[in-house]
A protein has these predicted regions:
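Acidic two-metal-ion nuclease catalytic site recognized across multiple nuclease folds
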Residues: 120-152
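A short, structure-level motif marking secondary-structure boundaries and short turns
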Residues: 43-44, 78-81, 124
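Acidic, divalent-metal-coordinating active-site segment for phosphoryl/phosphodiester hydrolysis
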Residues: 110-123
Length: 152
């Protein structure tokens, strides 16, 4: 999805993503797009690379637009997984990981990044890695990860 940010476009973001102000000028604004993506967040596990950052941006966007989203969303972060499961990699960037696993990636393009994260998760599951230590919950009211309780 492309979204009209309703703000000035920073050259840094265009250089990073290749997305220009012209490309999003006729795109829906976030509140309109939320009608489509909100139900997706209600449907299962969210998987992203550096997920806490992406979720915090989404949470602040919801707050700034005055959109109430009551959910605590289960998520898994492929960056956190790879740090622990593949420590031999030179870094834990998504493009490095995709190259290592021979996955196609058009970096910083949301659809491609999302597909890659799904493929990474499937790869880790196929190798028998235990993913339960990486399952987290994000609270969109507090805009933060819910810390697991520790029983003593």
């Amino acid at each position: 999805f492309l979204v009209n940010p309703e703000t000035a476009f920073a050259p840094f973001h265009t250089a990073l993503t290749g997305i220009t102000a012209e490309m999003v000028a006729q795109s829906p604004t976030f509140p309109v797009l939320w009608e489509t993506i909100g139900p997706i967040l209600d449907s299962g596990l969210l998987v992203a690379h550096n997920a806490p950052f992406d979720l915090s941006v989404l949470g602040r966007c919801l707050r700034d637009y005055g959109i109430f989203f009551h959910r605590q969303v289960p998520y898994a972060c492929t960056c956190q997984m790879i740090r622990r499961l593949l420590p031999q990699l030179p870094n834990h960037r998504l493009d490095t990981l995709c190259q290592y696993l021979h996955l196609e990636l058009d970096h910083h393009q949301a659809g491609s990044d999302s597909r890659a994260c799904g493929q990474i998760l499937l790869h880790l599951m196929d190798t028998g890695a235990s993913l339960s230590p990486f399952m987290r919950t994000y609270d969109f009211i507090r805009i933060g990860t819910v810390r697991p309780s520790r029983n003593r």
